[in-house]
């Protein structure tokens, strides 16, 4: 049996923060504003997994009003979704993600992000797609958005 889920997240940029994408840290002078570390890619992946399982969402599991989640590493969120997934005897077949932003240049860090996700998700790099899209002027806000689709398969 297969299940498919979609996850989405968006954050504004904030100067002076480190940027976290896919569990990797980039010190480029700005990061993503958020209650946690702001890793929009991991947030979207987490929600895609939870959605495929027809379970709760990241905001319910880890409320942004909770002091416990302040500056929390988004890998914790992903690990909880993976725990739920494994408990239900599912595994990830593949992941397809779009990062929509005018900055940073995703093509220069894509391989590093895919390597990180491969390690975190325990799936081959060939099963992970990270695509960069620009906003084409439709939104002048200084932000980054991610949309991910996760395909899961029941383990035999």
Curated annotation (Swiss-Prot):
Which residues of this protein are annotated with the site description Transition state stabilizer? 35, 134
GO molecular function terms noted in the UniProt entry = 2-C-methyl-D-erythritol 2,4-cyclodiphosphate synthase activity; metal ion binding
The record's section on InterPro entries has: MECDP_synthase, MECDP_synthase_CS, MECDP_synthase_sf
Pfam families cross-referenced by the UniProt entry? YgbB
In Gene Ontology terms, what is a biological process of this protein? terpenoid biosynthetic process
Give the residues annotated as coiled coil.
Answer: none
Q: Gene3D superfamilies in the record, alphabetically? A: 2-C-methyl-D-erythritol 2,4-cyclodiphosphate synthase
Cofactor(s) named in the record: a divalent metal cation
- Which positions does UniProt annotate for 4-CDP-2-C-methyl-D-erythritol 2-phosphate binding? 9-11, 35-36, 57-59
* Enzyme superclass (EC): lyase
Name the pathway it acts in.
Answer: Isoprenoid biosynthesis; isopentenyl diphosphate biosynthesis via DXP pathway; isopentenyl diphosphate from 1-deoxy-D-xylulose 5-phosphate: step 4/6
Quote the record's binding site residues for a divalent metal cation.
9, 11, 43
In short, the EC number is 4.6.1.12
The entry sums up its family as follows: Belongs to the IspF family.
What assembly does the database describe for this protein? Answer: Homotrimer.
The name this protein carries in UniProt is: 2-C-methyl-D-erythritol 2,4-cyclodiphosphate synthase
């Amino acid at each position: 049996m297969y299940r498919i889920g979609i996850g989405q997240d968006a954050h504004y940029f904030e100067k002076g923060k480190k940027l976290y994408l896919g569990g990797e840290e980039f010190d480029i002078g700005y990061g993503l504003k958020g209650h946690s570390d702001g890793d929009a890619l991991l947030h979207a992946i987490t929600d895609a997994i939870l959605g495929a399982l027809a379970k709760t969402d990241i905001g319910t599991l880890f409320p942004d009003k909770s002091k416990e989640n302040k500056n929390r590493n988004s890998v914790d969120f992903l690990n909880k979704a993976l725990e739920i997934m494994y408990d239900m005897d599912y595994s990830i077949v593949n992941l397809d993600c779009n990062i929509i932003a005018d900055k940073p240049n995703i093509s220069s860090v894509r391989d590093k992000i895919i390597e990180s996700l491969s390690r975190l998700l325990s799936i081959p790099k060939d099963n992970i797609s990270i695509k960069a899209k620009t906003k084409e002027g439709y939104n002048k806000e200084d932000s980054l958005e991610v949309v991910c689709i996760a395909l899961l398969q029941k383990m035999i």
